[in-house]
Amino acid sequence: FGQMMVKDHSAANAELGQVAAEMKIVPPTEIDKKHGELVERLSKLHGAEFDRAYIMAMVEGHQAVGAQLGEWITASRPLGPPPDGDRKAADLARGGPNEEKLTQWVMRTLPTVEKHLEGALALQKNE
């Protein structure tokens, strides 16, 4: 499972990097605080305790990412920046010439995220 995660995530991130470059968006180069804390917590665990925590993180993470990607596809809010002016990368793409590129990446990536979630749930069920 872990090897599949590395392979699939590396491929998706490389492809997203190409899309971001075409959109002239510079992606973050460092891990965010939430994921940094997860890595730190997991690095202190071993054996079955690590396995349980890792699988739980994979379930929660893939549920969240799947929901975000699904929201992108079925966005019901008007396109453009949010009213508070906080323009995230996804909002910069909305309504612009690059929206289709990002939407295509999302549509190619969502099935993989769903496959990872199914795998993590199966592992969680079998512990």
Predicted feature descriptions by range:
Residues 1-127:
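His/Met- and acidic-residue-enriched segments that coordinate or traffic transition-metal cofactors
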